[in-house]
Structures are given as structure tokens and as C-alpha cells.
A protein has these predicted regions:
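Active-site capping/gating segments
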Residues: 122-159
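N-terminal Rossmann-like NAD(P) cofactor-binding module of classical short-chain dehydrogenase/reductase
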Residues: 70-71, 96
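A conserved regulatory-domain signal marking ACT and ACT-like small-molecule sensing domains
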Residues: 281-365
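Residues in the short beta-alpha loop(s) of Rossmann-like NAD(P)-binding domains
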Residues: 43-44, 99, 330
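Interdomain hinge/lid region at the active-site interface
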Residues: 211-279, 296-299
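NAD(P)+-binding Rossmann beta1-loop-alpha1 motif at the extreme N-terminus of oxidoreductases
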Residues: 2-60, 69
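Rossmann-like NAD(P)(H) cofactor-binding subdomain of soluble oxidoreductases
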Residues: 82-137
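Internal alpha-helical scaffold of NAD(P)-dependent oxidoreductase catalytic cores
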Residues: 144-230
Length: 365
């Protein structure tokens, strides 16, 4: 099939979004920003009303054959059944979904289509690789998909123009489109999304045994690692169950690595070898703008928790004329202050440190 990145298709509306939680409502807001006619439907009418009230579209009120695109953003467990229902109700529409597991949906959909004699060629699976630990239409954001990957999973029975409509949907939301087979997609998300989520949960679960005075020592590292463990459990149960084969394979590989690590703990040289393997894996993750990660040095500046302090600091960093590779903030639990870690090229760290001190900032050595 033709690479979807070679053309610039235009999305044809009206668009009906079925399921308006975080993802559905965010798609609605993004499309409304682009001037698309967006309609909303949710089994919980309150969700539709809230989303409509916050600019995600209007309540669906057109004839079934008027819609040209149906976006299914329901919980994973009901996606296949919902796709079948919408293919039947909307004969002129391309139907796509946003669920993070494609193979299981396609298998169930194929079974349902065979049982009911339904043509599923107008269904093109997709998956926007974006989200937060929050849920519901009140958390929606029109910028959620900007510069994020949106996987489109075409099949040989799809019409080219139908696939291009899903590509146009993703691009209208500001996303970067990647075309990928459904089963390859499921392995990929197990590696880069589902396994990391479970590692976050395992780390957070281990904290239940920690004493309160030990938890008081926690810094930004543990908060970063456990942040996604706060995500909604019902949705993640469905995601992990749907992709259980690929997730199990990843967990078994981690189990082997844990056994290897345990065998190395009393041997410093072998332990360092293992740590180096982790560094090599981290370097494979794309850095800024999708480029290879580069070596940086952190210049850590103390900032008071007062209005305007961060803006002044950013202005002074800009005045130094040094390119910033990354930023992170650590809060001081003992007093009303924080620390901004400014990652720059190692050759510029000393210059930035001197500039910050000249502007009156306290810099950690």
C-alpha cells in the first residue's frame, strides 16, 4: 500500500466521534480548531454535553448517511462491536478507532463480520500515541496530538481513499503519521508503552511496603517513574488483556533480565556490564526532534516559589544565548522553593553557570 506520508489528503466531514472521554474530546477540539464539522455521541450523555460545552463539537443530530468519518474512541472492550454497529448505520462513512491494541480488535471484528455478513473494508484501524494519566472530557486538550505519532493500520481490503481520510484525520490533529501492520503495531506498543506502564506499576506497588519516614526521602526520580501508575485501571486492564500475548513476551524477557541482574549483584564488574547494557538501551530512544540522544550537562538553579520567578529565570537563560536541550523541575519538600535543571551541551555548562550567578541566581555546583 502507498506510504501515507507521500500525499496531503484533506479530511471530509461531517465527523462523528463516538465516545468523548479524554481522547475523543481532544480529537473533537483539534478538529474544531481546523474548522471541521464535528458531532459527538457518548453512551453517557453528560460526557457529550460537557465536551460540547468545552468546544469539542456539537451533539450528533444528522441523518446516519450524512457522516463521512466515524471515530470510535470508546473503551477497548466494546470497540469491535461499536465498529460493526457504525459500519451498518453509516453507509457513506469511513470508520476508524483509537484503541491502543489493533490485532485483537481486528480478530473480533472479522469474526463479527463473518457472522453477520458485514463488509468491513471501510474500517481502517488507527492509534494516536498520546494521552495522560487523566480521563474524561474535562481533561481534553486540542494540542494533545501535536507532533505525536499516530499509527494508521491499513489492510489489503481497504480502499486507498479511505486510508487517506484516516491519515487526514491524524494530520488535522497535528500528528505525525506512521503506517504499520496491526500485529507489528501490537508488538511495538508492548515494547514502548505497555511494558513501561507495568514497570511503573511494579515500582509503585513496591512502595506499599515502604515506611513513611523512608518515603519522605523520595525525590523527582521516583515521582517520574510512578507517575503513569496513577492511570485509570479499568482502561488499562482492557488494554493489557487485549495485548496479553505480546505483553507476556515482554514480561518474560524482563524476568530473565532480573534473574541475570540478581546473579551479578555481588560481582561489581559484571554488575557494571549490566548497567552499561541499560545505558545502551536508553541511547536508542529518540531525543529532541526525533534525533539521537546527545550528551548534556545539567546546570541546576534554585528558584523561589513566587509569581514571576520562573519567567525571570527563563529570560536570564535566554539572555545567556545558550541553546537548552531539556528542562526539568524538582520541588523542595522542606521549603517553598524548587530546582530547575537546565540541560545544555557540556562545553556551555560553565558559561551558563557563570551567567546565572551574575544574574543573582543560586546555582548548585
Amino acid at each position: 500500500m502507498t506510504d501515507p506520508n507521500r500525499v496531503e489528503p484533506t479530511l471530509t466531514g461531517p465527523v462523528l466521534i463516538v465516545g468523548v472521554g479524554l481522547i475523543g474530546a481532544s480529537i473533537g477540539k483539534a478538529l474544531m480548531r481546523e474548522g471541521t464539522d464535528v458531532h459527538l455521541w457518548d453512551i453517557d450523555r453528560d460526557n457529550s454535553l460537557i465536551a460540547a460545552g468545552h468546544g469539542a463539537g456539537r451533539l450528533g443530530n444528522l441523518a446516519d448517511d450524512a457522516y463521512r468519518m466515524i471515530v470510535i474512541a470508546t473503551p477497548p472492550a466494546v470497540v469491535a462491536q461499536t465498529v460493526v454497529e457504525r459500519l451498518t448505520r453509516h453507509p457513506q462513512a469511513v470508520v476508524t478507532d483509537t484503541t491502543s491494541v489493533k490485532g485483537a480488535v481486528l480478530a473480533e471484528l472479522t469474526t463479527l463480520a463473518t457472522e453477520h455478513g458485514i463488509d468491513i473494508s471501510r474500517y481502517v484501524g488507527s492509534h494516536p500515541m498520546a494521552g495522560t494519566q487523566y480521563t474524561g472530557p474535562l481533561t481534553a486538550c486540542s494540542e494533545l496530538f501535536v507532533d505525536r505519532t499516530w499509527v494508521v493500520a491499513p489492510r489489503t481490503d481497504n480502499r486507498y481513499d479511505d486510508v487517506q481520510q484516516v491519515v487526514a484525520l491524524a494530520r488535522a490533529c497535528g500528528a505525525r503519521v506512521v503506517s504499520m501492520d496491526a500485529h507489528e503495531h501490537d508488538r511495538a506498543v508492548a515494547e514502548v508503552s505497555h511494558l513501561p506502564h507495568l514497570m511503573s506499576i511494579l515500582t509503585a506497588a513496591n512502595l506499599r511496603r515502604a515506611r513513611p519516614e523512608h518515603l519522605s526521602l523520595a525525590g523527582p526520580g521516583i515521582r517520574d517513574v510512578t507517575r503513569i501508575a496513577r492511570s485509570q485501571t479499568t482502561m488499562w486492564r482492557q488494554i493489557l488483556s487485549s495485548n496479553c500475548v505480546e505483553v507476556r513476551s515482554q514480561l518474560e524477557a524482563i524476568r530473565d533480565d532480573l534473574d541475570d541482574l540478581l546473579s551479578r549483584l555481588n560481582d561489581s564488574e559484571r554488575l557494571e556490564e549490566f548497567l552499561s547494557v541499560g545505558q545502551a538501551g536508553a541511547r536508542k530512544v529518540a531525543g529532541k526532534h526525533g534525533h539521537q540522544m546527545v550528551e548534556t550537562t545539567a546546570v541546576v538553579v534554585e528558584i523561589p516559589d513566587t509569581p514571576g520567578a520562573l519567567a525571570r529565570l527563563f529570560a536570564d537563560v535566554e539572555a545567556a544565548g545558550i541553546n537548552v536541550e531539556d528542562l526539568s523541575v524538582e520541588h523542595n519538600p522542606a521549603r517553598e522553593a524548587g530546582f530547575l535543571s537546565i540541560d545544555v551541551a557540556p562545553s556551555r555548562a560553565e558559561q551558563l553557570t557563570a551567567s546565572m550567578r551574575n544574574h543573582g541566581w543560586s546555582v548548585r555546583s
